[in-house]
């Protein structure tokens, strides 16, 4: 698969009122999809791919059979009919965000359900924020294997950080 991806930038209108020119910027990047322990925040499994890969294809790679919880929490990028059917066959309960219907406002019930799901799903975002802010993780490698090694080491360091946090917390009572 091609690791290059395009990032689209919407141009602002020009001063004379004419529309600006939209641009597409090619960029080289990687994605890290993780599953975490909801109780303690440890990273259970990680899959690194190039940035051009669709998120919905990653769900099967990060959902593990050794996880005793039946709920699967994810954002809308992971929702597809194939993933929903797969989760049902795996006896899992989908807690994946719902997308807004095209051309209509999101129903209030769906919006409230997404807000409730976000409270749990935000734990995953803490993993990425911790890696970016505390560890200064920025991938500047060429080759998926090097990027995977760097991200795996960052995940290991994050898990050690979480372990120390829980050990100190338990020691304090």
Predicted ranges, named:
Residues 63, 88-90, 173:
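Short, solvent-exposed amphipathic alpha-helical segments in soluble enzyme
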Residues 90-98:
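Short hydrophobic/aromatic-enriched beta-strand-loop microsegments
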Residues 1-86:
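Polybasic low-complexity intrinsically disordered regions
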Residues 70-73, 95-96, 165-166:
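Acidic/polar loop patches that form or flank catalytic/metal-binding clefts of enzymes
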Residues 112-173:
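Basic, amphipathic alpha-helical segments enriched in Lys/Arg and hydrophobic/aromatic residues
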């Amino acid at each position: 698969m091609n690791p290059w991806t395009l990032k689209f930038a919407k141009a602002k209108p020009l001063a004379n009122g004419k529309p600006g020119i939209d641009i597409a910027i090619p960029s080289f990047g990687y994605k890290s999809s993780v599953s975490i322990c909801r109780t303690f925040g440890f990273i259970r499994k990680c899959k690194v791919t190039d940035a051009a890969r669709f998120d919905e294809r990653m769900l099967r790679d990060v959902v593990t059979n050794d996880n005793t919880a039946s709920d699967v929490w994810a954002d809308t990028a992971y929702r597809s009919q194939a993933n929903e059917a797969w989760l049902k066959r795996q006896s899992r309960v989908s807690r994946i965000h719902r997308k807004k219907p095209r051309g209509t406002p999101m129903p209030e019930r769906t919006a409230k359900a997404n807000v409730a799901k976000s409270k749990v799903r935000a734990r995953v975002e803490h993993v990425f924020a911790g890696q970016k802010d505390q560890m200064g993780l920025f991938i500047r490698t060429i080759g998926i294997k090097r990027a995977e090694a760097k991200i795996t080491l960052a995940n290991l360091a994050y898990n050690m950080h979480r372990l120390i946090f829980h050990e100190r917390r338990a020691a304090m009572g």
